[in-house]
Amino acid sequence: LGQNVLTAVKPSQLMVKIVHDELTQLMGGETVEIDTKGQPAVILMSGLQGSGKTTFSGKLARMLKTKKNKRPLLVACDVYRPAAIEQLRVLAEQIDVPMYSEIDSKDPVSIAQNAIKEARAKGYDLVIVDTAGRLAVDEQMMNEIAAIKEAIQPNEILFVVDSMTGQDAVNTAKEFNERLDFDGVVLTKLDGDTRGGAVSYTHLRAHE
């Protein structure tokens, strides 16, 4: 390791710090807060099917509610998978956060716009829009999420990727970024894989 071990610090604690510092450097070296300015601030989720967007949407809502005193509204814009709406509803109930959906609508752009109107009317200062999973090669689906972005002008667009995707995540992230110009990457399921192929897009771009 080549590190001087301080006598007042346990070797195990020093190891944790070394790993933390290395991971911080790998992920870009700086901590950047999510932009939650606005009435409401809007965060748009994007990513492949099964990447963990819905679960992360709930976790993000809970974190911003408890640590930033935000009043979030979760929005179900996956009009293709009814189970996704139910999953988001259950998560919303568990964290005591309201959820907006339109069961009979097949227009995610309209749903997202109506949700923002609902947030303004009821005083919610944060809207988290959960969208359907999609492949970058599916032109129709990519046009759809681009239309959602254009309609709601989100503060942040997050690309959610399963860390078990491996190096394929690099190409997928680049393809999504070309269409959406996203602001950040969320790595999910980090406890389930050791390959570490999906890494910070900031790191990837710096080493192209």
Residue ranges and their predicted role:
Residues 31, 60, 144, 171-173, ...:
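Short beta-alpha junctions and helix-cap segments that line functional grooves
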Residues 69-70, 152-156, 180-183:
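Short glycine-/polar-rich loops that comprise or flank the Walker A/P-loop
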Residues 1-77, 84-105, 111-129:
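Primarily NTPase-proximal linker/entry elements flanking Walker-type ATP/GTP-binding cores
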Residues 149, 169, 173-183:
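Active-site/ligand-binding-proximal alpha/beta "capping" segment
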Residues 202-208:
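Conserved small/polar residues in nucleotide/adenosyl-binding loops
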Residues 77, 132, 161-164, 186-193:
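G-domain G4 guanine-recognition motif of GTPases
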Residues 143-162:
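Inter-motif core of Ras-like GTPase G domains
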Residues 84-85, 137-142, 169-170:
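Conserved ATPase-coupling elements of RecA-like P-loop NTPase cores
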